[in-house]
Regions:
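A conserved glycine-rich beta-strand in the N-terminal activation segment of trypsin-fold
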Residues: 135-211, 440-526
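Active/binding-pocket-proximal capping segment
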Residues: 370, 380-398, 420-422, 464-467, ...
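One face of beta-strands
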Residues: 40-42, 92, 107-109, 152, ...
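Long, C-terminal catalytic modules of enzymes
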Residues: 211-225, 461-583, 589-591, 596
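Structural boundary/hinge residues at secondary-structure and domain interfaces
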Residues: 22-139, 177-247, 256-363, 374-404, ...
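Bacterial N-terminal signal peptides
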Residues: 8-17
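Bacterial N-terminal signal peptides that target proteins for export
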Residues: 1-8
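Intrinsic, low-complexity N-terminal interaction/targeting segments
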Residues: 79-93, 412-439, 519
Length: 625
């Protein structure tokens, strides 16, 4: 330990003696003090601007972030022990190193300082070397390095050693990432590739355990391959991610957030996504009642079909299952998916709305742009027949009963598909059917298909309100028109995205609570408001950009709903800023747990070693009986 402290002090002295340009870069100076090996950071260009934005957010939504006048400054004081001398207008950066290598003491705080004398006096800083201090007035070890107008704070001298003298993270970041950090928006950065490397063994172990638990469930083997295939797909997507960046902007009437995902070189998902052409079909105002969610996206038809076929082939041939499927079953399912996918055009829109009283919890509608309406009808018939055969091979019971609807909607013929499902433990068949009726109405899970010109409308559930309105909108000569709320959303999210999601947050939240079993009287009457939340996704070469806009009105109404249905949820943001129950007077710092318990036997090292802590002695061998 003494050797490590000496090396750290020497590095600090050398850096302080260097040219000013080396320690205080012109771009993002707080960020420039993080070492290259940082795997994540949170950068705030201005503390005062962030707290001003949070105060405006609290005034508009009622969701208070902290109780004090300066919640962020108070939070930093509790985490670092630095109570006085911090510049409330400066920039802040919090970096994170490898948790395994640094034994849970991996956090680096870079704070702006306006008065070094007040800072050191209030925290009882003792000089270790020029520019390096040990804080004696706080709970747990704290070390501070003076770097120009900034204080670098760590809870371990070994962590400080990794900071001082290391190559700056800014030199390793892409130029656009640095430019984003210099802007006036708080920014979060995560190197997903590094995190995957650090936790590779834990991730593999978790996946093996999770998939094993799936197969261990009674009567779950027929469905386990579906769930494991889904898990593999999510894991594959994450495995192709390289970095994630997020920036938050406070606007007068809402919050705007930008998210950027970069994929590793040669990622299959990037190759697929980069081929998509921009352009969005406007989400129609399909009903007078609020639509809880609407999703519309445009995909390149050839790439989309290729993706659907590759996913189907993987499910049929590579998904883990006790016995392989017969070739005849795989062939019919594959051909059905191919015919259906090739009949679709660029645009697909999904709508969800609360059902009318007595008609279940929700009603869903999908609107597909078609290349060939007749081929679409044939594809639906093939899908129904092929999935019946697949269900039989998986020891399920699934039959589709197709019948023409007795009453056409707006003069459009409707075909109804009634699936008959039976699976799992026989005693739960009735419970399963009751669950479907609760969700979708008296008919349970029912699909209705109507073709309107070059569009297909597919409805789920007994409530036909949204289904009828969508058909009427598509019959108009000028096509569907966006609702007023959607037109206002277009001011914040560009329409030339590949994927656009719009939500009425309180309606969507109320619908989700009802689906989860929350009593209707606790949910009460849901006010949809006049705005909608939007998520837009644009795919580029080896990257995806996500733009989000959350109006204050939607957040306020969602909070009012949560205060009735889940009052404990409204305290979650405030709990992050509550003072710790223990700590020194005025600082509120949570005492750090010791690396080793006081009574743990430790073998002293044979020689001074600045790189690794002393090993724990092995437990004595048991006596032979």
């Amino acid at each position: 330990m003494r050797t490590r402290i000496c090396l750290t002090a020497l590095a600090a002295a050398c850096l302080l003696a260097g040219p000013a340009g080396a320690t205080e870069p012109d771009v993002a100076p707080a960020l420039a003090l993080l070492p290259e090996e940082a795997v994540a950071f949170f950068h705030v260009p201005s503390l005062s601007a962030l707290e001003k934005g949070l105060k405006h957010f609290a005034d508009q939504t009622g969701w208070t972030i902290g109780k004090g006048e300066r919640p962020i400054l108070d939070l930093l004081a509790r985490r670092t022990g630095l109570v006085q001398g911090i510049d409330p207008t400066g920039s802040v950066c919090i970096g994170f190193l490898d948790p395994k290598r640094f034994r849970q003491r991996y956090t680096i705080y870079v704070l702006p300082v306006s008065d070094w004398d007040a800072l050191l006096k209030s925290s009882r800083g003792e000089v270790m070397s020029p520019g390096l201090y040990a804080l004696m007035g706080v709970s747990g070890p704290r070390f501070v390095a003076r770097r120009g107008k900034f204080a670098v704070v760590t809870s371990s001298i070994r962590t400080m050693d990794a900071v001082l003298g290391a190559r700056s993270l800014i030199e390793a970041l892409p130029a656009e990432t640095v430019a984003r950090a210099v802007s006036d928006a708080p920014m979060l950065y995560l190197n997903v590739d590094s995190v995957k490397t650090i936790y590779e063994s834990e991730i593999a172990s978790w996946f093996r355990a999770s998939s094993g638990q799936v197969y261990d469930q009674p009567n779950a083997v027929p469905y386990a391959d579906m769930l494991v295939t889904y898990m593999l797909g999510i894991a594959s997507f994450i495995d192709q991610m390289e970095t994630v960046e997020a920036a938050l902007k406070f606007e007068p009437e809402g919050l705007a957030a930008d998210l950027k995902i970069r994929f590793v070189d040669g990622a299959a998902v990037a190759d697929f996504l980069s081929a998509q052409a921009p352009g969005i079909l406007p989400i129609p105002a399909v009903t007078e009642q609020p639509v809880s969610s609407a999703v519309t996206f445009r995909l390149n038809p050839a790439r989309r079909t290729d993706f659907a076929l590759r996913a189907t082939r993987f499910f049929l041939e590579s998904a883990p299952r006790p016995e392989p499927l017969p070739e005849s079953t795989k062939k019919t399912v594959y051909e059905a998916v191919q015919v259906f996918a090739e009949s679709l055009g660029d645009h697909i829109t999904f709508l969800s709305a609360p059902a009318q009283p007595g008609m279940g919890v929700e009603s869903g509608v999908a609107v597909y742009e078609l290349v060939d309406p007749e081929r679409f009808r044939h594809g639906v018939e093939l899908l129904a027949a092929s999935w019946e055969g697949l269900a039989d091979q998986l020891n399920l019971y699934l039959k589709f009963k197709a019948l023409p609807d007795m009453t056409d909607l707006a003069g459009v013929p409707v075909v109804t598909y009634v699936p008959r499902l039976r699976f799992g433990i026989p005693a739960r068949h009735v419970e399963f059917r009751q669950r479907l009726r609760m969700l979708y109405g008296p008919e349970g899970m029912v699909y209705r298909v109507a073709v309107v010109g070059n569009y297909a409308v597919v409805a789920t559930g007994s409530d036909l309100t949204v289904f009828r309105k969508a058909i009427e909108q598509l019959q108009k000569a000028d096509g569907p028109a966006p609702s007023p709320a959607m037109r206002r959303l277009y001011n914040h999210i560009s329409r030339d995205e590949n994927l656009l999601i719009a939500l009425s947050l309180p309606v969507y939240l109320g619908q989700s609570l009802a689906r989860g079993g929350t009593a209707a009287d606790r949910i009460g009457t849901v006010d949809p408001g006049h705005e909608v939340i939007g998520f837009g996704v644009r795919f580029g070469k080896a990257e995806a950009e996500v733009t989000t806009y959350l109006p204050h009105e939607q957040i306020r109404l969602a909070r009012e709903l949560l205060s009735r249905a889940l009052p404990e949820a409204t305290d979650i943001p405030e709990s992050l800023f509550k003072p710790a129950p223990e700590g020194p007077p005025g600082a509120g710092v949570v005492p750090l747990k010791p690396l080793f318990p006081p009574d743990t036997p430790v073998v002293p090292p044979t020689a001074p070693n600045a790189e690794s802590p002393p090993p724990i002695a092995a437990a004595p061998a048991p006596r032979p009986k």
